[in-house]
Amino acid sequence: MNKKIFHILVVDDDDRIRELVKEYLVENNFLVTTAKDAMDAKKKLEIVKFDILILDIMMPGEDGLSLTKEIKKNNPIPIILLTAKGETHDRIEGLELGADDYLGKPFE
């Protein structure tokens, strides 16, 4: 029996965070693609069907919250927001815009 390998898109403008998350996920048998910003993510979402999106909120250009709202209009993909914004109202805003979960930075 073949086990499904989940394909995850990690979007973060910080190269170090992007690579750290990718490395962890690959070590745990996930297929990972990365994007450096919202525009890069949109291009990849047009051509690949991902199972999960891990998305930083604070990025130059379009931020993760507006990207979440845009994606969720037409795509039921689960979105996990990844950010240093840890206030309760920040979490609520992200979840109200369609995010499925929220992971605060820094993380171990």
Protein language model annotation of sequence segments:
Residues 29-36, 44:
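Short hydrophobic/Thr-rich beta-strand motif most characteristic of the beta2 strand and flanking loop
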Residues 43, 62-76:
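Short amphipathic alpha-helix used as the core "switch/output" element in two-component signaling
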Residues 19-27:
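Charged docking surfaces used in two-component/phosphorelay signaling
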Residues 37, 63-66, 90:
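Acidic catalytic/metal-coordinating carboxylates
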Residues 48-54, 59:
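Active-site beta3 strand of CheY-like receiver
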Residues 18, 60, 87, 105:
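The feature encodes the CheY-like receiver
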